[in-house]
Amino acid sequence: MLFRSHQYPRVQPCVITVITRGEDEILLAKNARNTRSNMYGLIAGFVEVGETLEEAVRRETLEEVGIQVKNVQYLASQPWPFPSNLMIAFKAEYASGELCLQEEEISDAQFFKFDQLPEIPFKGSIAHAMIMHATEGTTVADDTREWL
């Protein structure tokens, strides 16, 4: 008798968060491992076993830049097929704390005025769409592929 077992793909959930402060500031961070570019992006990281997505947003933000966030809300998701990641996008608001960088992950992080953004991720990435949503009020589509 032959038993067939199903192989389910292993997907690694990652949270990525756009954090605003007040009506006109956005937190952007520079990845310490990206030494060839002056590009700033968003806070992101893997979800740990037993953790909710919202808890992952709060933990990653506290670990990487030392601040607390509030009003964490889901925005969208984007598959990254190599290496099997699913980027799950959230927006949050600054709650408290001073920026204190996890230097092995983040080389710089600042709150930028919406009209004074540094170099940001390319159009077509979920990070770019999230930054535009926060700074220019672009809508989030029901289908993430339309939003990007």
Task: State what each model feature region is.
Residues 7-12:
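Short Cys/His-rich "knuckle" micro-motifs
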Residues 15-19:
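Short beta-strand scaffold segments in enzyme catalytic cores
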Residues 20, 93-95, 112:
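Solvent-exposed residues in well-ordered beta-strands and their adjoining turns
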Residues 20-36:
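Active-site-adjacent "gating/activation" loops or surface patches in catalytic cores
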Residues 35-40, 102-148:
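Nudix hydrolase/Nudix homology domain
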Residues 42-76, 90, 98:
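The catalytic Nudix box helix
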Residues 78-101:
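Active-site-adjacent beta-strand/loop module that shapes the phosphate/pyrophosphate-binding cleft
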